[in-house]
Structures are given as structure tokens and as C-alpha cells.
């Protein structure tokens, strides 16, 4: 639904998935839209799996917090970055790189988890565990893969520093309010999430435009 909503709003030619992994999220994107699809990841094995899908080009980058993306300036129409920034020591470095490779007026679709909506805070209070939605059930605090915990405001601030303006908040796709979320109409989910993303969404999903 997130990709469909994005493509309903913008036109794309070159699409780049930063942190594409095995391609599970964007590997079939060319069935939805006519584009040139680039995948970038730090895991060589994952890239081997992604190579079985519809990517036109796959690129290996060792470290997203210090390595320049081997992509030309102002050459990409849309960058997708899902579940990556929360793993990085310096996520601003990557968002700056994404801004560099995007064309003027290009778009950035980004998603990060929100560990602490209302339900997450209650779980933390009861269990004293930062993994509020069991993303990594085998991890402990000393090796927990998520090292950055974002709010809507902190995401907007970081995007602003990288030269972006948020044009759509699609976090309502990740509305979470215990068992009741199944019975809440989409319009109400959207309203609650826009009013208070941090309280009602399990993930922060934003579409931003390069200024």
C-alpha cells in the first residue's frame, strides 16, 4: 500500500532502494511502474538473492555511515530507504548522500520503526524491554541492532537538515493500538496518526521532496 500510494503521487524514472536487502520490498516494483531499479546494500549475500529479481543494477557499500554512495549526483528520481536509519551511528550522513544523488525535486520515501507508541510504552513499562514489538527476540541490550530511536519531529528535523520537505505522512499504514486497530476505519486511523504519529503508529513513514 505504501508504494502504491507513492506512485499515485509522483512519476519516476530512476528508483534506488538503499538497504534493499534481498529485494523483498522493491524487487517487483517494475511490475507496478516502468523504471530503472537500483539496489544498494552492505550485505553481499543479500545482494546475491536480490540479483534473482528485477533489479537493473546492484551495488555493494560497506558502511552507510561513512562511505559515499557510488551513484552520480542528481541522477535519481526516487530513493526508498526502509528500516535502515535506525541501525546507523550517523544517519544524517546517509540522508545527506541521498539528497546528493536525487534530482532537484526528487523524492525520498523513508520508513523507520517507532518502538514507543502508546502500546509500546505500556509494553516497556511492564516488560522493561526496548524491543517492544519483538523485532529481534534473540537480542539483548548490549547487541540490540537498533541504536537510533526516532520520533516524527526528529525525523522531520533530520530531513530538513538534508534539504528535504515532508509532503506526506503515511505512517497510518502502521497504525497500532492493540487489538482495536483491526476494527478502526482507515479514515480514523489516518486522522489519529496525523494528529499524533508518535502515539498511534508502530512505524514512521514519510514521503519527502528534495528542495
Predicted feature descriptions by range:
Residues 1-12:
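Conserved alpha-helix/loop element of class I SAM-dependent methyltransferases that forms part
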Residues 12-19:
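Conserved class I S-adenosyl-L-methionine
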Residues 13, 56, 77:
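Conserved acidic residues
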Residues 14, 36, 165:
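Residues at the starts of beta-strands that form the adenosine-phosphate
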Residues 24, 28-67:
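Class I SAM-dependent methyltransferase SAM/SAH-binding core
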Residues 24, 42-45, 49, 89-97, ...:
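S-adenosyl-L-methionine-dependent methyltransferase catalytic module, highlighting the catalytic core
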Residues 68-78:
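A short acidic, Gly/Pro-enriched loop at the edge of an enzyme's catalytic core
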Residues 81-82:
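A short beta-strand submotif of the Rossmann-like class I SAM-dependent methyltransferase core
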Amino acid at each position: 500500500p505504501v508504494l502504491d500510494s507513492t506512485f499515485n503521487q509522483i512519476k519516476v524514472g530512476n528508483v534506488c532502494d538503499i538497504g534493499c536487502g534481498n529485494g523483498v520490498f522493491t524487487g517487483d516494483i517494475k511490475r507496478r511502474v516502468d523504471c530503472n531499479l537500483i539496489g544498494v546494500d552492505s550485505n553481499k549475500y543479500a545482494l546475491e538473492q536480490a540479483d534473482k529479481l528485477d533489479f537493473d543494477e546492484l551495488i555493494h557499500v560497506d558502511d552507510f555511515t561513512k562511505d559515499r554512495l557510488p551513484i552520480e549526483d542528481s541522477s535519481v528520481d526516487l530513493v526508498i530507504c526502509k528500516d535502515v536509519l535506525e541501525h546507523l551511528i550517523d544517519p544524517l550522513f546517509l540522508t545527506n548522500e541521498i539528497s546528493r544523488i536525487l534530482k532537484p525535486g526528487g523524492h525520498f520515501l523513508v520508513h523507520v520503526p517507532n518502538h514507543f507508541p502508546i502500546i509500546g510504552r505500556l509494553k516497556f513499562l511492564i516488560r522493561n524491554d526496548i524491543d517492544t514489538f519483538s523485532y529481534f527476540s534473540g537480542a539483548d541490550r548490549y547487541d540490540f541492532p537498533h541504536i537510533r530511536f526516532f520520533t516524527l519531529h526528529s525525523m522531520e528535523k533530520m530531513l530538513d537538515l538534508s534539504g528535504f520537505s515532508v509532503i506526506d505522512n503515511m505512517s497510518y499504514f502502521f497504525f497500532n493500538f492493540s487489538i482495536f486497530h483491526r476494527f478502526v476505519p482507515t479514515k480514523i486511523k489516518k486522522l489519529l496518526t496525523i494528529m499524533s504519529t508518535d502515539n498511534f503508529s508502530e512505524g514512521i513513514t514519510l514521503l519527502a521532496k528534495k528542495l
